[in-house]
Amino acid sequence: MPHLLEKLYYNGLYGMQACAGTTAPRLSGLWVGEWNLLWRSAYTMDANVNIQVSGMNGSGLYEAGVGYMWFILRQIPDWVNNAAMVYGMKDAVLIPVNTDGHRAMMVEYDINYPFQYWNAGAGWMLIPIYEFLQTYGDAVITTFDASLIKMYGKDTFDVRKDVYEPLLKKAYNFWKQIGNPEYYTDT
């Protein structure tokens, strides 16, 4: 088992280095060495993104961690909207299973796999940010991305105060609300 975990770790690290560009690596990246394919090379949030970014902090890939922050920040407004649209929640986040990396609206609904009920997404996506803080301490990052500057009204972000803590609070609010009898009934 330790050998398998080591292989997964190095496979993820390879995917991150070979395919990430300035953001997290896409699903197809590890197969073709490309990160901006014209076909639906989605970011698969419930597995591929997390496996591929798992080695970034422990390997000292600071820039990859910063790219992951931009990837997350670009999507948070849609995550908040997803929680409101699917569950009627306020100040909470619901992460989709797949995203194009720029927007993250819930668009996949399937009777065989209930994509819209992947409730563990926020915690899953927070882990690399927590590890970034554990590895590098408090950091301030700067973007030159006009869309992020427009979205947030600034170009610098304190990773703990502007990214991690607000997202953690929204994840907490999700679980606090879903534990409410309005969403959950013990039968």
For each feature predicted by the language model, list its residue ranges.
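A structural signal for well-ordered alpha-helical segments within the folded catalytic domains
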Residues: 6-10, 47-50, 66, 123, ...
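Well-ordered alpha-helical scaffold segments within catalytic/enzyme domains
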Residues: 15-17, 51-63, 124-139, 148-156
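Structured segments of extracytoplasmic/periplasmic soluble domains
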Residues: 15-18, 55, 71, 75-78, ...
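Short, well-structured active-site flanking segments
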Residues: 21-30, 65-66, 136-144, 177-186
